[in-house]
């Protein structure tokens, strides 16, 4: 089903790209936009995950420089019956996390240094289980491609003014009004697609994540802490790349941005309530042979991500 959704997404984004191209340059602009969109679709399938990780300057870690964090992800992946994903950390004081990759065999999970500092090991396990659920549900391909194409469409809408703003442009059938429409409609349409994709999948990932880690309350507690942190601690890389907001477990954009006029995520309180109800009903075990992860409590130092000094890397809580 997700393959069908991904194909529909690519078709919609391509059509939107062509529409903006038509508004800017008529039929010639539409054909150029089609060729660009086709190339971007191909490129996004193979490289969008690396682009997102690069945008946040995420550093890959392993059992040597992040032993406890890596072990949590490894145990959760085993519980879920998934191949071990690549594990990344990115340097940000805001607690948050995301997953990416075109399939479970080529997937990655990334957490911020702020997440490891602010959350307990159990809460980190809940968050990583949620991200692994996205991988298992094959949400990551659609979410990552959406981030790449939405960013490109928003940028195209901004460029429309400069390349199509000439009132005397004979190639532009709708003139200056058409350019204004492109500037407004393109980013808005991309935002609406992000909303539709993210909101319908977060509840499913919450539920499956609770099953993977074995305790819905771990994730519920983590969501509350992350939401409070995201509301007060900015993520500068996310502010520069708002098209990736729907990939995170909690919207990383500050409340002052107009991007939050249409939220990319369900209400956090509703998500927490659903997890608490799941715990109260005893529905914390999946149909498969899942055992609860039991993270070892240690101090919360985090590995060096290569951006803040030359101290030797250490594992979280080590």
UniProtKB/Swiss-Prot annotation:
CDD domains: M48B_HtpX_like. Its EC number is 3.4.24.-. It is found in: Cell inner membrane. It comes from the Bacteria. It is an enzyme of class 3 (hydrolase). It holds the Pfam family Peptidase_M48. GO terms for cellular component: plasma membrane. Binds 1 zinc ion per subunit. This is Protease HtpX homolog. It comes from Rhizobium etli (strain CIAT 652). The lineage of its organism: Bacteria, Pseudomonadati, Pseudomonadota, Alphaproteobacteria, Hyphomicrobiales. The gene is htpX.
């Amino acid at each position: 089903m997700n393959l069908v959704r991904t194909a529909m997404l690519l078709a919609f984004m391509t059509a939107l790209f062509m529409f903006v191209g038509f508004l800017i340059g008529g039929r010639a602009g539409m054909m150029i936009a089609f060729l660009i969109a086709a190339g971007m679709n191909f490129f996004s399938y193979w490289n969008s995950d690396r682009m997102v990780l690069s945008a946040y300057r995420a550093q890959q870690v392993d059992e040597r420089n992040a032993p406890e964090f890596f072990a949590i992800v490894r145990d959760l992946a085993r519980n879920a019956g998934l191949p071990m994903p690549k594990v990344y950390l990115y340097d940000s004081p805001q607690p948050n996390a995301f997953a990416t990759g075109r399939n479970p065999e080529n997937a990655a999970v990334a957490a911020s240094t702020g997440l490891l500092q602010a959350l307990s090991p159990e809460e980190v396990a809940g968050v990583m289980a949620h991200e692994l659920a996205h991988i298992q549900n094959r949400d990551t391909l659609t979410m990552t491609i959406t981030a790449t194409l939405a960013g490109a469409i928003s940028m195209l809408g901004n460029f429309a003014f400069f390349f199509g703003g000439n009132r005397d442009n004979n190639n532009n059938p709708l003139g200056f009004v058409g350019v204004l429409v492109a500037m407004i409609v393109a980013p808005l349409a991309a935002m609406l697609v992000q909303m539709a994709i993210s909101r319908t999948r977060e509840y499913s990932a919450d539920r499956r994540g609770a099953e993977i880690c074995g305790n819905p309350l771990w994730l519920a507690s983590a969501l509350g802490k992350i939401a409070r942190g995201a509301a007060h601690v900015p993520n500068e890389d996310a502010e520069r790349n708002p098209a990736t907001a729907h990939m995170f477990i909690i919207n990383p954009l500050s409340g002052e941005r107009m991007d939050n006029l249409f939220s990319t995520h369900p209400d956090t309180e509703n998500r927490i309530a659903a997890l608490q109800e799941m715990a109260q009903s005893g529905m914390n075990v999946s149909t498969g042979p899942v055992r609860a992860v039991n993270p070892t409590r240690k101090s919360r130092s985090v590995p060096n991500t290569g951006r803040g000094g030359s101290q030797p890397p250490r594992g979280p809580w080590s």
